[in-house]
């Protein structure tokens, strides 16, 4: 089969044999790709350093039966240097990469929107000018939107009645009107769902003026909504929470949201 080229974000890697690695890539045109990078653990490897997690690369690959083979790599953006130098940035970016892999869908299914979103998010994390918790929640909301899992924020998740609505129920799919509100719904403080909408839509001027208490509440809702659809928590999110010193009450609140009953139709 012919060689192919694609832009990719390196999501993760692990050792193979004495000198090789298997890398997991989120490519623009071929989606999730797993490939062998031969000899990259040797000190004289031509492109070993370019295949570290967080790297944005242009790669040439040879299709294989189970795993492709990396034959050439050109660095586009070296985000890793700025990301790994700060633990908070590192844990935030790790959560983004884990989310990207979980939401990419079937291997080799084109994922241009998720690829572009992930590149932009890593660039913003590496830049360090915006709040990491806002960046992460914005990424999670938009990534879920690409996957078709975005929570309803401006209308009722059940009957589509225009909002704003005060109640939120993860199992129902987001905000719910008084008539559709299931048992176990939470009622976020005023402004919380507005912040979620701002993060989803990219209204950073509004988002950056919100109090930390609202941001903490949004983090709980976003993580709960993502966990509901993935059916398990991201391994990296607890590390991010410790970095931001999320209050114990927020963690308890999140557990309550996850425990909402499923009889919401």
From Swiss-Prot:
<comment type="function">
    <text>Involved in DNA repair and RecF pathway recombination.</text>
</comment>
<dbReference type="Pfam" id="PF02565">
    <property type="entry name" value="RecO_C"/>
</dbReference>
<dbReference type="GO" id="GO:0043590">
    <property type="term" value="C:bacterial nucleoid"/>
</dbReference>
<keyword id="KW-0227">DNA damage</keyword>
<dbReference type="InterPro" id="IPR003717">
    <property type="entry name" value="RecO"/>
</dbReference>
<keyword id="KW-0234">DNA repair</keyword>
<dbReference type="GO" id="GO:0006310">
    <property type="term" value="P:DNA recombination"/>
</dbReference>
<dbReference type="Pfam" id="PF11967">
    <property type="entry name" value="RecO_N"/>
</dbReference>
<comment type="similarity">
    <text>Belongs to the RecO family.</text>
</comment>
<dbReference type="GO" id="GO:0006302">
    <property type="term" value="P:double-strand break repair"/>
</dbReference>
<dbReference type="InterPro" id="IPR012340">
    <property type="entry name" value="NA-bd_OB-fold"/>
</dbReference>
<protein>
    <recommendedName>
        <fullName>DNA repair protein RecO</fullName>
    </recommendedName>
</protein>
<dbReference type="InterPro" id="IPR042242">
    <property type="entry name" value="RecO_C"/>
</dbReference>
<keyword id="KW-0233">DNA recombination</keyword>
<dbReference type="InterPro" id="IPR022572">
    <property type="entry name" value="DNA_rep/recomb_RecO_N"/>
</dbReference>
<dbReference type="InterPro" id="IPR037278">
    <property type="entry name" value="ARFGAP/RecO"/>
</dbReference>
């Amino acid at each position: 089969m012919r060689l192919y080229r694609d832009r990719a974000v390196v999501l993760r890697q692990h050792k193979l044999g004495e000198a090789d690695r298997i890398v997991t890539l989120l490519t623009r045109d071929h989606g999730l790709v797993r490939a062998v990078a031969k000899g990259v653990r040797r000190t004289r490897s031509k492109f070993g350093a370019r295949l570290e997690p967080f790297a944005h690369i242009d790669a040439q690959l040879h299709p294989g039966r189970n795993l492709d083979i990396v034959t050439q790599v050109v660095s586009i953006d070296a985000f890793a240097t700025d990301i790994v130098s700060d633990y908070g940035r590192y844990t935030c970016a790790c959560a983004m990469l884990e989310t990207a892999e979980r939401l990419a869908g079937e291997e080799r299914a084109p994922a241009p929107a998720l690829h572009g979103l992930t590149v932009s998010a890593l660039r913003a994390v590496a830049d360090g000018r915006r709040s990491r918790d806002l960046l992460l929640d914005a990424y999670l909301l938009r990534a879920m939107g690409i996957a078709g899992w975005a929570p309803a924020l401006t209308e009722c998740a059940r009957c589509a009645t225009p909002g704003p609505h005060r109640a939120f129920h993860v199992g129902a799919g987001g905000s719910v009107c008084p008539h559709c509100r299931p048992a176990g719904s939470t009622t976020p403080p005023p402004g919380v769902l507005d912040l979620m909408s701002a993060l989803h839509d990219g209204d950073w001027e509004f988002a950056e003026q919100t109090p930390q208490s609202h941001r903490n509440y949004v983090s709980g809702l976003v993580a709960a909504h993502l966990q509901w659809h993935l059916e398990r928590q991201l391994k990296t999110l607890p590390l991010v929470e410790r970095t931001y010193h999320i209050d114990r009450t927020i963690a308890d609140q999140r557990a309550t949201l996850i425990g909402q009953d499923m009889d919401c139709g």
